[in-house]
Amino acid sequence: MKTTEYVAEILNELHNSAAYISNEEADQLADHILSSHQIFTAGAGRSGLMAKSFAMRLMHMGFNAHIVGEILTPPLAEGDLVIIGSGSGETKSLIHTAAKAKSLHGIVAALTINPESSIGKQADLIIRMPGSPKDQSNGSYKTIQPMGSLFEQTLLLFYDAVILKLMEKKGLDSETMFTHHANLE
């Protein structure tokens, strides 16, 4: 297959994955973000990169957004929101993050393929995501892509869609958000 044909197939998979995401769950996440004093994002590996990109856009919107594990991350306070992206919902470090957030009376939102996972069971809000686990032999969702690629890509697109929803709710545009962009580059 040609590279451009692979691109087309990946885009087709991403297009189809949108139908598996609940607008109601997405709206609940947006509402939690709007009502939270601080928002923390977490993920491991490529899912962690997606979490960082989401925190960055939230910061561009003026939200008090942080990335779990960074050296400048402040303490979580009661009622703060922790958004965890984990395909399997069984990543050990993220299970610990969810448990710690709950012990501090934070609100945990889990974006996962597996709502019945250890992280899902601790979550106050679950956003069910399409995709295949890294070990695709146990997955019911078929993809041509390796390991968790479809989940990770869908996660990024979902985060960007939530940003658009928040922009709409707050009446923001890209130009306004750019005033929060780094300027020491």
Swiss-Prot record:
InterPro entries: PHI/rmpB, SIS_dom, SIS_dom_sf. It is an enzyme of class 5 (isomerase). Pfam families: SIS (PF01380). Transmembrane segments: none annotated. GO terms for molecular function: 6-phospho-3-hexuloisomerase activity; carbohydrate derivative binding. PROSITE patterns: SIS. CDD domains: SIS_PHI. Its EC number is 5.3.1.27. GO terms for biological process: carbohydrate derivative metabolic process; formaldehyde assimilation via ribulose monophosphate cycle; response to toxic substance. Substrate binds at S47, S86, G87, S88, G89, E90, T91. Keywords: Carbohydrate metabolism, Detoxification, Isomerase. Belongs to the SIS family. PHI subfamily. Homotetramer. Catalyzes the isomerization between 3-hexulose 6-phosphate and fructose 6-phosphate. Together with HxlA, may act as a formaldehyde detoxification system. This is 3-hexulose-6-phosphate isomerase. It comes from Bacillus subtilis (strain 168). The lineage of its organism: Bacteria, Bacillati, Bacillota, Bacilli, Bacillales. The gene is hxlB.
